[in-house]
Amino acid sequence: MLDTGGGLKKAAWFFQDSRGHSGKETPFILHNVDVLSTIDLERMRQLHFETQALATLAVQDRETSRYLLFDERRQLCGRRAGRNQPPELVRPAQQARAWAFSGIHVISPRLLAMMTEDGVFSIIASYLRLAAQGEKILAFRADEYDWRDLGKPENVAQAVQDLK
């Protein structure tokens, strides 16, 4: 297991020729396999295109063990281990908002060449490093959508019950 960052970097060859018919770079969706959601991927992709972000991350205002921090322009500026833990800022923010990452990203292929990490690594490490360098890693607010973590058997069983 290479974690999300290591796995994506290993598959980078697949995205090397990412130019569409228009000759413009074609972003792709990266979606954690253990997530079930109704998040509008087309709206998310459209926001990504409109803002020319390097990456756009689906986030929600919900309880989690780790939070990503975003500034007033919805740009990634840090992370926090828990809601009551001190923030770890990688760039200044007047007011950092803590949102839970949903494991769904829209990524511009140019990100792949910027990933300097090797081996097993979280893509969040790349995002934080790139945000510190001024790259645009944006939040897509997805509070109005359903989202479930299916990483535990009991969560899968509950989702099956709810979908009946």
Give the positions of each predicted feature:
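Short gly/pro/ser/thr-enriched loop/turn and capping motifs at secondary-structure boundaries
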Residues: 2, 63-65
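Short phosphate-binding loop-to-helix
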Residues: 1-28, 88
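A short, conserved acidic/glycine-rich loop-to-beta-strand motif
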Residues: 51-61
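Catalytic-core segments of class I nucleotidyltransferases/pyrophosphorylases
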Residues: 21, 25-29, 36-37, 41-49, ...
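Acidic metal-phosphate-binding loop of nucleotide-sugar-dependent transferases
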Residues: 1, 34-37
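A structural signal for short hydrophobic beta-strand segments in well-ordered beta-sheet cores
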Residues: 68-70, 139
